[in-house]
């Protein structure tokens, strides 16, 4: 907030480490995706962390982003006609985005806190949330994602296998590799090593 002073000592070190996690290349990719997903009317931010924060701070662009991943008629977040100017309304808009992102499938561990964006505490966490949202959109592949699919990693998906009863029976007769092998080198034809012990009395 406006009345929060600069941090010193240990707090400054912690804040500095958090700020180093912010990725400017990732910022460019996320801006490209948001503009492609929401349309050019969302504009573009000034380069850098402060521009990125100011661009997303009121929650309207984030709300448009998550709404664009749903089919028409089932948009989860109500986007106001005019961007909210009151602080609590902006924070409420961001909170609605976070709720919609969680409903979409983003895990709690990938979510940022509202203050991370609003006060600029941890913009890397904001990037993480947007990356997780993009990855889910690419993975779902339901036709609502717009942009380059290579911008985000596809999440691993379950791949169930069905076996017939005869295949399961055959599997019981296979010696697992953990048991060792019954082929290859053996001790057949080997004689004892060395000479026998000579005991002379």
From Swiss-Prot:
Modified residues (Omega-N-methylarginine): 183
InterPro entries (UniProt xref): Calponin-like, Calponin_repeat, CH_dom, CH_dom_sf, SM22_calponin
Molecular function via GO: actin binding
Induction conditions: By growth factors.
Keyword check for Cytoplasm: yes
Modified residues (N-acetylalanine): 2
Modified residues (N6-acetyllysine): 172
Annotated positions of the Phosphoserine modification: 166, 181
GO annotations of cellular component type: cytoplasm
Key words, A-Z: Acetylation, Actin-binding, Cytoplasm, Methylation, Muscle protein, Phosphoprotein
GO biological process: epithelial cell differentiation
Calponin-like repeat residue numbers: 175-200
CDD domains, A to Z: CH_TAGLN
Cellular compartments annotated: Cytoplasm
Residue stretches making up the Calponin-homology (CH) domain: 24-137
Task performed by this protein: Actin cross-linking/gelling protein.
Similarity-based family: Belongs to the calponin family.
PANTHER family: CALPONIN, TRANSGELIN
Protein name according to UniProt: Transgelin
Species name: Bos taurus
Taxonomic lineage from the root: Eukaryota, Metazoa, Chordata, Craniata, Vertebrata
Gene: TAGLN
